[in-house]
């Protein structure tokens, strides 16, 4: 696939997602990084977003709960280039009814080449990166060219 570029602004649009067994860990991570995260635009699946708002006072765009379609909403926002970073603390040891949605979400984050943290260590590396608070250009699929090729 042909690529183009997209510039991610210094003020990031960050999606927060977590499975039930990981919510406490994600909340602790958000609290630890509250001052920095409050400088960015936060989105989250329903339960996670409400827990983050209640615990931190940070405004969060709350979507549907993951099993009710929230993971797919986040995926759609990624495809629309409205999410710059995905922080997704998922539980690899417990299956969830919406596992196909989880796989689709991670696939879209990979297709659109956004940074993804699936555990606390990776989230720490990501938020401590010099790129986190600055403008950065990433390579993404050239969808217009892709569509042109498909319509030939």
From Swiss-Prot:
GO terms for molecular function: methylglyoxal synthase activity. It catalyses: dihydroxyacetone phosphate = methylglyoxal + phosphate. Pfam families: MGS. It comes from the Bacteria. One of its GO terms (cellular component) is cytosol. Its EC number is 4.2.3.3. The active site is at residue 71. This is Methylglyoxal synthase.
